[in-house]
Amino acid sequence: MNAYDAYMKEIAQQMRGELTQNGFTSLETSEAVSEYMNQVNADDTTFVVINSTCGCAAGLARPAAVAVATQNEHRPTNTVTVFAGQDKEATATMREFIQQAPSSPSYALFKGQDLVYFMPREFIEGRDINDIAMDLKDAFDENCK
């Protein structure tokens, strides 16, 4: 592994940890994503964070995701994450389930295998973190009862 790849892997581990230390399951292979999505219960809700190394992921996407997923009254059954740019095959497989234009960071909320909510990067970057959190809260309140 070259120095750049080693550095990015180390940085990504810290960023991944911001989610996994708060209950998110990291899906790091295509097989892990497929296995998870194909076994999920039809009545379960799954909140997916497509993680990224960019500043808007660090300052907005991850903190908002953690706050709402751990503190909101209505919460998803499951919380998972894939890391764009790091776990490329896993991210590509998750994007096949999402069926939206590739965007990272981004959020997806599923009921079973049905996408019920999606927030792409352009609705994260440059916004106030409280507005992002309120959008997630509204999606959870509507779909995670």
Curated annotation (Swiss-Prot):
<dbReference type="InterPro" id="IPR009474">
    <property type="entry name" value="BrxB/BrxA"/>
</dbReference>
<dbReference type="Pfam" id="PF06491">
    <property type="entry name" value="Disulph_isomer"/>
</dbReference>
<comment type="similarity">
    <text>Belongs to the bacilliredoxin family.</text>
</comment>
<protein>
    <recommendedName>
        <fullName>Bacilliredoxin SAOUHSC_01436</fullName>
    </recommendedName>
</protein>
<dbReference type="GO" id="GO:0045454">
    <property type="term" value="P:cell redox homeostasis"/>
</dbReference>
